[in-house]
Structure formats: C-alpha cells, structure tokens
C-alpha cells in the first residue's frame, strides 16, 4: 500500500522582486505542473493495477503499519514537500516535515543542510521514488516484493522477537550465521545495518511476512561477501513454514 497521499511543490526565489518572481515562476512552473500531473496519473494507474490483480486488499502486515502511522502523525500525515529554497527547507525540517530539495541553476549557493534527498531534474521523478523518500523520513520499511501469500520488506526492530524464535532452531543456523545472543547488540547492529545498507545501497537482507497473519516467517535478500564482487542471494525460512511450496 502507499503511504504518500500528497506532494506539495514550492518554488520561491530568495530576495527577488515581484517581476523576478513572475519570471522565476514562468521558468520553473511548467516543470512543477508536469510532475504533479505525472504523479497523479501514476498513482491512479497503481491503484487500478492493484484492484485488477487483487493486491489492493490490505494484508494484516500493511494494516498494522497503517494503523500505527495514523496514530503517530496528525495534519502532516502522508505529505512530502519538494522545495527549491534553502530557508524554506529548514523551516519544514524543523517542523518534522519530509523534504526533497529541487536543485537548479538559480539556487546553487543556497544551504540545504539536513535535507536527505535532492534532485536536479524533477521531471525524472516518479511516484514510486517519492513514496520511498517519504517512507525514509517517517521510518516506514520499504516493501520489496508482494506475492499471493508473502510480503517481503525491510527489517525493523519489531521483527526481532520473531527472528530470535526462528533462529533458535539448530537447523536454521546449521549453514547460516545466527543473531547476537544479546538483544541490545542485535538492535544496535540492525540500526547500523539500516543506515549503511538500506539507506546507502537500497538493498540487503529483508524480512518475509505471511500476508494473511502478519507473522514474520523468515528472511531473504542479498549480502556483500568479502572477496566477492557480486552480492550473494540467500534466504532463511522458519521451520514451521518450510515445505509449503
């Protein structure tokens, strides 16, 4: 499911006269409206596709995350800001708003410190990317793959209880490395892993959930092994869910 509900684009030249503002708006306004139209069209296509293939129905896992989001965010829920003014970007960040900076020839000297994402050509953006940017700001795991029975998504700290149960079976760790015995160390490792793998490489080892129940049933993904150029693909399925096709 999509958590991004609204995209707001602001173009604002710093210290410009009224005439300069009009020229500025004319120069960048067309690109802004083109993006908004594209986002609207792409979102409609996604909703239609989900309804057609039956994936539009919320699974247990998706509903749980949505309910958590609704209780944690208020008026700014689901909104991403795209701005080209450094001061405005800082104001929004201080308010806890997700921000993407639009960089162009007229704002090269402005300060966008703290903004986690930026683009030079907004016409290259699409809804899927903006959804991912929004999720990064509000700490919602990216969904990697959805099948009829499973949801593959980024791992979060709430998964650890279930993962410890899965890895407690000796057959699971026979050919793969287990978790840290100390919960605190595993949480610290997951935090570093999220920042250094998910945020930087946009891939890694993910969590597999049963769509019907939301139960964590295993892990799958890619690992970078020392001495090898290409990532290694691997998976772990909890014993109760093995041999089910």
Give short role names for the model-derived ranges.
Residues 117-121:
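Short acidic-hydrophobic, aromatic-tinged amphipathic segments that line or gate anion-handling sites
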Residues 81-113:
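Acidic, Mg2+-coordinating phosphoryl-transfer loop and its flanking beta/alpha structural elements
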Residues 41, 122-240:
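GNAT-family acyltransferases
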Residues 56, 65, 108-109, 123-128:
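A short acidic, often aromatic-flanked loop/helix-cap motif at beta-alpha or helix-coil junctions
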Residues 77-79, 116:
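Conserved acidic residues
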């Amino acid at each position: 499911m999509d958590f991004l509900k609204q995209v707001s684009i602001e173009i604002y030249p710093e210290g410009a006269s009224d005439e300069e503002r009009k020229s500025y708006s004319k120069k960048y306004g067309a690109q802004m409206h083109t993006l908004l139209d594209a986002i609207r069209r792409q979102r409609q296509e996604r909703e239609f596709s989900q309804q057609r293939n039956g994936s539009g129905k919320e699974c247990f896992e998706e509903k749980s995350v949505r309910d958590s989001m609704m209780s944690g965010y208020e008026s700014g829920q689901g909104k991403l800001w795209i701005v080209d003014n450094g001061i405005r970007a800082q104001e929004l960040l201080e308010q806890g708003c997700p921000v993407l900076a639009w960089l162009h020839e007229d704002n090269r000297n402005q300060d966008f410190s703290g903004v986690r994402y930026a683009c030079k050509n907004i016409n290259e953006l699409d809804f899927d990317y903006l959804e991912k940017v929004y999720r990064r700001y509000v700490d919602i795991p990216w969904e990697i793959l959805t099948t009829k029975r499973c949801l593959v998504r980024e791992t979060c700290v709430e998964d650890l209880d279930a993962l410890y149960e899965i890895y407690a079976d000796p057959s699971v760790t026979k050919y793969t490395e287990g978790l840290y015995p100390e919960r605190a160390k595993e949480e610290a490792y997951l935090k570093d892993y999220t920042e250094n793998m998910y945020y930087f490489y946009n891939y890694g080892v993910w969590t597999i959930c049963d769509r019907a129940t939301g139960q964590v049933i295993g892990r799958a993904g890619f690992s970078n092994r020392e001495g090898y150029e290409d990532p290694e693909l691997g998976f772990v399925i909890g014993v109760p869910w093995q041999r089910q096709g």
